[in-house]
């Protein structure tokens, strides 16, 4: 049982951050908060407005990476959330309450747990929450990217939304993708390469890890995601080009071939990358320069 030493209201008045620590200890240790202590939390919650956002963020992050991250619900039930930030307070409304479903299988890493907590938010809303709490720019970028892509089907696999709305339908959808994987592997790999090209390798790995955790309640969907993980490994093992840096030609090559320096160089390289994502065999300097030359002549 979590309780204060002495009078709870006095302890929380001395340092309002203790109200968040009480909830964090509850999540870390699995203990319940004693009734009088909880009542004092509700009463002293407005004092949290006087605590620096950095200190508030540290407690919320520790809560989210705890063994019981879903206990962040208590931050809302005790009336603390309005005193964190307006956008933070609205997260349950935006998500329909699903923000409190944070599978313990999601790795206890700051960016992953924050992303899962805010996965129903728009990326810009997630950024507002994290900036208000003074999180570092790298974490904000990682969370924003994950929030943007968690709800997207990469290659036709069921998303968390489709699983929640129609689990049987999601299982059927997963079955179709499984057949596609066995018959049209190249088409699926093209889609996966495109998705991989949109973010850093580590972030893409985090995205698949999170998607897999959120698909656990639908085994066929989870099986599809494991198959996509295997395809990802195959793409990397084969050295398939998935970024501008991996292209066999560079901007300098295009300029030497006669193209004027400027935005057009970047545009052409992006067009070439799209062709190579479809078929990695095309990624040779000779082929790509001849292709660009024929386009210029036309």
Regions found by a protein language model. Give the residues of each.
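Acidic, glycine- and histidine-enriched catalytic cores of nucleic acid- and nucleotide-handling enzymes
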Residues: 1-37, 43
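Charged substrate- and nucleic-acid-binding regions of tRNA-handling and nucleotidyl-transfer enzymes
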Residues: 1-5, 24, 207, 213-298
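A residue-level signal for conserved active-site and pocket-lining positions in enzyme catalytic cores
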Residues: 15, 20-23, 74-75, 147, ...
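A generic alpha-helix surface/boundary motif
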Residues: 20, 54, 123-127, 247-253
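Amphipathic alpha-helical segments within well-ordered protein domains
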Residues: 23-24, 42, 61, 127-134, ...
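Short, well-structured alpha-helical segments
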Residues: 38, 42, 72, 89, ...
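Double-stranded RNA-binding/processing signature
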Residues: 46
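Conserved, hydrophobic alpha-helical core segments of structured domains
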Residues: 49-220
């Amino acid at each position: 049982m979590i309780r204060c030493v002495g009078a709870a209201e006095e302890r929380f008045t001395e340092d309002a951050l203790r109200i968040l620590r009480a909830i964090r200890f509850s999540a870390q240790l699995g203990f319940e908060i004693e009734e009088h202590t909880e009542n004092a939390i509700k009463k002293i919650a407005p004092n949290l407005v006087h605590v620096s956002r950095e200190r508030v963020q540290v407690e919320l992050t520790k809560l989210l990476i705890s063994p019981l991250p879903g206990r962040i619900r208590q931050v809302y039930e005790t009336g603390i959330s309005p005193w964190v930030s307006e956008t933070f307070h609205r997260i349950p409304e935006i998500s329909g309450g699903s923000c409190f479903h944070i599978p313990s299988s999601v790795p206890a890493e700051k960016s992953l747990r924050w992303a899962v907590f805010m996965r129903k938010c728009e990326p810009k809303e997630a950024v507002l929450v994290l900036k208000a709490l003074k999180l570092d720019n790298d974490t904000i970028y990682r969370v924003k990217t994950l929030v943007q892509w968690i709800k997207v089907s990469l290659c036709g696999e069921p998303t968390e939304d489709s699983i929640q709305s129609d689990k049987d339908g999601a299982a059927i959808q997963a079955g179709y993708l499984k057949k596609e994987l066995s018959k049209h592997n190249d088409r699926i790999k093209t889609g996966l390469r495109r998705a991989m090209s949109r973010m850093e390798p580590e972030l893409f790995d985090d995205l698949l890890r999170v998607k897999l955790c959120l698909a656990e309640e639908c085994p066929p969907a989870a099986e599809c995601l494991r198959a996509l993980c295997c395809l990802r490994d195959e793409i990397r093992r084969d050295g398939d080009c998935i970024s501008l840096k991996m292209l066999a030609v560079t901007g300098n090559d295009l300029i030497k071939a006669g193209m004027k320096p400027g935005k057009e160089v970047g545009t052409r390289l992006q067009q070439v990358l799209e062709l190579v994502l479809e078929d990695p065999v095309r990624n040779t300097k000779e082929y790509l320069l001849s292709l660009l030359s024929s386009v210029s002549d036309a």
